[in-house]
Amino acid sequence: MKRKILIAVGDCSHSRSAVKYAATLSQPAKDTTYTLYNIQAAIPGILLEEAPKNPECEAEIEALVRERDNAAKCTVGELKELLVKHGVPESHIEVWITPMEYGMAKDILDQAEAGNYDTIVLGSKGLTPRRDVFVGTTATKVVEHALKTSVWVVDEYTESRDILIAVDASENSLHVLDHVIASIGGKKGFRFVLFHVRPYLSHYYSLECERNNPNLQKLIQDRDRHRMEDFYKEAFARFETAGIARSQVEIKTNEHGYDISTAILEEARRGAYGTVVIGRRGEREAFFTGRIAMRLVQKMPSAALWVVA
């Protein structure tokens, strides 16, 4: 199955970390392509309108554009070499350099949709224009609005091959596993931890409702245990089919996670995982959606965070 990875890059250390991470972690399959996507800072419209009236200003703008273009080509060229150095065939790498049109995050999302990319990879910092710094980072906005494309946010390069995958018993969690398996393939040395937060009525309603309905609380947890047993059977079958040994996969359950994002953050930091993976949707309406994904990308519990669409 053909896979396309869009790596949004700039001249910053976080972009270099993102490129190296994508090259070393993802499976360099023969049908996987990597696009290095560089968005150049736009020349303010007022300068473009007024400069032609002043030859000296027009010459300065032309020099500024040449300098910008040359810097972008140099940056992307270095990052392409980094991909090749870490095992990606040069024939699998595409380069796209373009001026900003609507804004950094919007342009990345539009390119991902137009190119039908499976995954967006970007650094947690470094791509946000100065004028947008108080609006929110590019990574945060991409995660918030990439409803159909998975996003990998990389804070720093890591050699850790420990991956924490937050799961519930939903079909979407199986889709998350499929994304992990397709991205990593049968590469050796990885450890996968399937992390489940036991459901509470307070995940749906108030704490008072939970206290006042002990039978419902027991019912929801008993049912969850049975459903997770079925989920794990299917999960192990999919790992095995992909060539991932049973010894590489662990199960962890948080029985007292009244706040789901906090439970994930605590486990991620306690276990010092290199990568944390969550799904955008789950059984509980708020389980891995908006609020939780946004909190995790702001806190960055690991070197890399995946939000799987």
Describe each PLM feature range.
Residues 1, 44, 66, 78-120, ...:
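Structural beta-alpha unit
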Residues 1-62, 161-218, 237-250, 299, ...:
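Small/aliphatic-rich secondary-structure junction motif
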Residues 3-4, 21-28, 107-159, 266-309:
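Gly/Ser-rich helix-loop-strand patches that form or flank binding pockets
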Residues 15, 101-102, 173, 257-258, ...:
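A conditional alpha-helix N-cap/helix-loop micro-motif detector
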Residues 21, 71-79, 107, 226-235, ...:
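Short, solvent-exposed amphipathic alpha-helices that sit
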Residues 57-74, 214-230:
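A short acidic, glycine-rich active-site loop
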Residues 57-58, 185, 213, 260-263, ...:
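Membrane-embedded alpha-helical bundles that form conduits across membranes
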